[in-house]
Every structure is written in structure tokens, then in C-alpha cells.
Design a protein with these regions (language model features):
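Positively charged, proline/Ser/Thr-rich regional signature most characteristic
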Residues: 1-62, 143
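Structural motif
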Residues: 15, 62-64, 135-137, 158-161
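Catalytic cysteine-centered active loop of the rhodanese-like fold, especially the PTP/DSP P-loop
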Residues: 41-43, 49-95
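Active-site flanking residues adjacent to catalytic metal/cofactor-binding acidic residues
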Residues: 17, 139, 165
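Conserved beta-strand hairpin/beta-sheet module of binuclear metal-dependent hydrolase folds
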Residues: 107-155
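Cysteine-dependent PTP/DSP-like catalytic domain, specifically the C-terminal lobe
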Residues: 89-107
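Active-site HxH/HxHxD metal-binding segment of metal-dependent hydrolases
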Residues: 123-124, 144-221
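Short, structured coil segments at secondary-structure junctions
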Residues: 33-37, 83-85, 181-182, 202-204
Length: 222
């Protein structure tokens, strides 16, 4: 999935062939892809065609075949290869795409050694890792925190704090579990630990942080 994300970001003209049933697309699709290069044809219908061109596929670029978990797409990609197309299966399918985080370095603020962004194109979400003096804060972590842990290890830092900038409407935060596993604080604004409709307080332990307060991290302050 990371390789595909980088190729799309670079503007490569790829065809995305999603072989799931149309109703499954609501769970997520590979994007951003121009409409004319996104094809949704169930695999059983596609392999019944005499010519893949009947499905609107052209041979002017790689065809990336997508299914739920990367099994059906392997068979379709093999069938397309025999038919003369440059076809590849997306490893892990849309499930892997939705969970993938793509790390990239950003300009580093004063007092910090690294600022790493985690782009999650499947969710349209971003996370971060701030590093200073061997200490790191993981921000807006997904339920799959391995990329944050890997990047911290790569730059020789230890995650000493976890934070969420807000309660996320489109995914479940991995912040509480990561903080608990590392035995470090999980920072959150107190207003985000209250159910907005009836004021019921949340049950997760957290460290409150509000505007005007700061968190010390190595040589820096957030």
C-alpha cells in the first residue's frame, strides 16, 4: 500500500481496478484517482469477459487490482497478465489500504529534532511524531500504532507522551491503548472526554490539557 500511495502522489497514470461488489465500496476505496482510471467490476464478471478491454481497461499503464484482503485480486491480476496487461495485486487489499500510514518528514520547529507526519490516505487523516532530545510525542495515533513506534526507534527516540488533538469522527483513536502500553500520559482536552448530547463523562483515564498550557518534551515545549 505504501508503494501505491507514493506512486499516486507522484502522479503516475495507474488504473485502479476494484473487483469488489459495488455495495462494498462504501467501506472505502483507493484514492485520489481520476474517475476515468477507476474501474469497479466484480471479479466474477470480469473473468467471464472475452477481452478485458470490454470493461474499459486500456494498456497505457499498470493496472492495480484491489479486493477486500488481497486474495481475489491475485487471481484477477494473474488473468490480466496472461491477457497482456501489466497488472499487480494490492497486497492486503482495501483493508491494508485503510490501515496504512505513510510517514514523511516536515520542517522541524525550534527546539525539536524531528517532526514526522503520518499521512493516512484511506481515512483522509493525519498523525504526527514530535521528537526532541531523545523523547517523542505521538499525536493522533491510529489503532495500528506500529508506524509511530518504528519511526521513533529509527530516530533513536522513546515515546514519552501521547496526545489527541480532538475526538475523531471518522476513526477510533489508538492513543489510549498506546499510552497504556507504554505507561505514559495520554493528553486530551477535557471537553473531549464528555459525551456532547447529555454530558456523560468518559471512562478512559487521561491527562487534561487546555489552551495556554504546555507539555515539555526534551529540549522543546508544546
Amino acid at each position: 500500500p505504501r508503494d501505491l500511495a507514493r506512486r499516486l502522489e507522484a502522479g503516475e497514470e495507474l488504473h485502479i481496478l476494484d473487483v469488489r461488489a459495488p455495495a462494498r465500496l462504501a467501506a472505502g476505496v483507493v484514492s485520489p484517482v481520476p474517475a476515468e482510471r477507476f474501474h469497479n467490476i466484480p471479479g466474477s464478471e470480469l473473468v467471464a469477459m472475452a477481452d478485458p478491454a470490454d470493461a474499459g481497461l486500456t494498456n497505457d499503464g499498470d493496472v492495480i487490482v484491489v479486493c477486500g484482503r488481497g486474495n481475489d485480486s491475485l487471481r484477477v491480476a494473474a488473468w490480466l497478465t496472461v491477457a497482456g496487461y501489466r497488472a499487480k495485486s494490492l497486497a492486503g487489499g482495501i483493508n491494508a489500504w485503510m490501515h496504512m500510514s505513510l510517514p514523511r518528514p516536515l520542517p522541524t520547529p525550534d527546539g525539536f529534532d524531528h517532526l514526522i507526519q503520518f499521512d493516512r490516505p484511506g481515512k483522509g487523516a493525519l498523525g504526527y511524531l514530535l521528537v526532541s532530545g531523545g523523547e517523542a510525542m505521538a499525536v493522533d495515533v491510529s489503532m495500528y500504532p506500529e508506524p509511530w513506534l518504528q519511526e521513533a526507534k529509527r530516530v533513536g527516540a522513546r515515546i514519552t507522551a501521547v496526545a489527541d488533538t480532538h475526538v475523531h469522527a471518522d476513526y477510533i483513536s489508538g492513543g489510549p491503548d498506546l499510552a497504556a502500553s507504554l505507561e505514559v500520559p495520554w493528553y486530551l482536552h477535557p471537553a473531549d472526554m464528555v459525551y456532547p448530547y447529555d454530558g456523560t463523562p468518559g471512562a478512559l483515564p487521561f491527562t487534561p490539557i487546555a489552551a495556554g498550557e504546555e507539555i515539555r518534551l526534551g529540549r522543546g515545549a508544546i
